[in-house]
């Protein structure tokens, strides 16, 4: 597993939240695998962007374990996390017998859906 980190100064005010997203090889929770996840957290006056990724499906369990450790008891902001990311992760946790972790998720995709910005005429 590899990790890439970028840090930049900020005055934004989203303390105590973790921005989160995953990347997978496809949409099928049983056949495809997760090869990357990214998080962004604010610490003091810095935004810390971290990406965790694997190059081989055999490392997927290690990636899921790291994800569960980092996101446990966090307030998360995701985009379509309720419908895709977290169901995908839960399926993989079952596969690898990894215990569930606690988190609170705000899915901005669901919030945007309520605004009907994408409705067809």
Identify the residue ranges that each predicted region occupies.
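RNase H-like nuclease fold core
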Residues: 24, 28-43
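N-terminal accessory regions of nucleic-acid-interacting proteins
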Residues: 1-15
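Conserved DEDDh/DEDDy metal-dependent 3′-5′ exonuclease domain
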Residues: 47-121
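Long, contiguous hydrophobic alpha-helical segments, chiefly transmembrane helices and signal peptides
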Residues: 22, 35, 79-81
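Short connector loops at helix/strand junctions that flank enzyme active sites
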Residues: 15, 32-34, 47, 71
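Two-metal-ion RNase H-like nuclease active-site motif
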Residues: 16-25
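Hydrophobic, well-ordered secondary-structure scaffolds
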Residues: 10, 27-31, 117
